[in-house]
Amino acid sequence: MSSTTTQAFSLKTRQAVDEDALLTEEDRVVKEATKGEDCTTRRRACKNCTCGRAELERKMLAEGKKVEMPQMPAGGCGNCAKGDAFRCATCPFLGQPAFDNTSDGKVKLNLTDDI
């Protein structure tokens, strides 16, 4: 049985990799991030509002009309109470801490002594 040994890697024969050769033309195209069409997931207009919602709210307040807050949609995936790691992208509770959805909106405090 003859065994031939071949080196899998040698520092002497290592060639520098041309980083530009790794990218394709499709990779080089700069892609712009897209913004959502509406801001119905927020209760108020953003500080730097660009969609026109801030102007609409100011106009309605000047006319003496009540600014109607959009209804927060109920989550459809059923994972809203578990936390951001389990929530869908359109969850109205995104960014909020996990909660107990069986408590009817009441906060449970643990007031027992540790001693």
Swiss-Prot record:
It is found in: Cytoplasm; Mitochondrion intermembrane space. It comes from Trypanosoma cruzi (strain CL Brener). A motif (Cx2C motif 1) lies at residues 77-80. InterPro entries: Anamorsin, CIAPIN1. Keywords: 2Fe-2S, 4Fe-4S, Cytoplasm, Iron, Iron-sulfur, Metal-binding, Mitochondrion. Residues 39-51 are annotated as: Fe-S binding site A. One of its GO terms (cellular component) is mitochondrial intermembrane space. Its cofactor is [2Fe-2S] cluster; [4Fe-4S] cluster. A motif (Cx2C motif 2) lies at residues 88-91. Monomer. [2Fe-2S] cluster binds at residues 39, 46, 49, 51. This is Anamorsin homolog 1. [4Fe-4S] cluster binds at residues 77, 80, 88, 91.
